[in-house]
């Protein structure tokens, strides 16, 4: 009898051409995206996890609940009141907290509020109105650079001890880097000689659009000059700031609340106080 030749292959000795994708253990399989490096997805997951942990630790160690802290922070940054006034307002609501504790809350959460709010702002247009105002810090006058677009939407701000070309360049770089801004087509400024020098150097280095136009027309800056009052009226009850860092953090909170109240946040009205409170609670992942 003739026996047909057959290939007997043991499972452990299976040649490579007989192995299918289904027979390979899942731990040995990896999928590669044409646009993503092998370790990128894992690094992104770690970054997301770290961000979630940072948000969870936002109110860790505080002796008051998150809703009380955010209520105090929101009201201080919204209205021209002092820390002692806010202490009495909280006491009227049966919350006993010292005004120095409220000060620490503002220093801790004002900058964080401004940072988390930026991705939720509507896009501004390319017509910038730039001006600087004065803020008293430890008995000295400092310069607060501010910029709004033609519709009055806040673009960015910067507190500086000097008023020169380097300070103007730092401000322009900071403003262009924000997620809700575009490279400007026109920049309207006052007669300060530092602005043309800063704009020319940044165009040469490719940091500003080479066709952007710098206009030194004073009356066109009425929009930003009128917008200064949102910050000036809030800083008056405090009679100035004690240090540069204290001023920088507090002003960041003032500007963030001004953006919200001007209706710059997406789908949030400027007069809808309840929606604004929910937005701030959402930014800090707290139940409103």
Please place each PLM-identified region on the residue numbering:
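Short conserved beta-strand segments at catalytic cores or DNA/RNA-binding microdomains
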Residues: 80, 138-154, 164, 172-176
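Short, solvent-exposed beta-strand edge segments and adjacent coil->beta transition regions
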Residues: 154-155, 184
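Conserved phosphate-coordination/catalytic loops
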Residues: 63, 162, 166
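Charged, often Cys/His-bearing segments associated with DNA-binding zinc-finger transcription factors
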Residues: 2-137, 170-288
């Amino acid at each position: 009898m003739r026996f047909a030749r057959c290939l007997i292959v043991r499972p452990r000795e299976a040649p490579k051409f007989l192995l299918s994708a289904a027979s390979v253990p899942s731990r040995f399989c990896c999928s590669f995206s044409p646009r993503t490096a092998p370790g990128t997805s894992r690094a992104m997951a770690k970054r997301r996890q770290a961000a979630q942990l940072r948000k969870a630790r936002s109110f860790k160690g505080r002796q008051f609940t998150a809703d009380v802290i955010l209520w105090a922070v929101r009201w201080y940054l919204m209205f021209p009141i002092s820390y002692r006034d806010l202490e009495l307002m909280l006491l009227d609501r049966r919350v006993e907290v010292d005004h120095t504790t409220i000060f620490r809350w503002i220093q801790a959460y004002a900058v964080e509020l401004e940072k988390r709010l930026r991705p939720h702002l509507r896009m501004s247009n390319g017509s910038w109105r730039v001006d600087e105002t004065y803020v008293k810090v430890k008995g000295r006058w400092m310069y607060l650079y501010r910029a709004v677009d033609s519709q009055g939407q806040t673009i960015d701000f910067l507190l500086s001890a000097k008023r020169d070309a380097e300070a103007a360049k730092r401000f322009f770089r900071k403003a262009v880097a924000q997620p809700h801004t575009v490279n400007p087509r026109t920049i309207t400024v006052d007669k300060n000689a530092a602005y043309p020098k800063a704009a020319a150097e940044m165009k040469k280095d490719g940091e500003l659009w080479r066709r952007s136009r710098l206009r030194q027309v004073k009356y066109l800056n009425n929009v930003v000059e009128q917008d200064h009052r949102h910050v000036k009226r809030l800083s008056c009850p405090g009679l100035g700031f004690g240090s540069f860092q204290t001023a920088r953090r507090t002003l960041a909170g003032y500007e963030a609340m001004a953006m919200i109240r001007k209706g710059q946040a997406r789908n949030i009205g400027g007069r809808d106080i309840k929606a604004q409170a929910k937005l701030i609670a959402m930014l800090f992942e707290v139940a409103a």
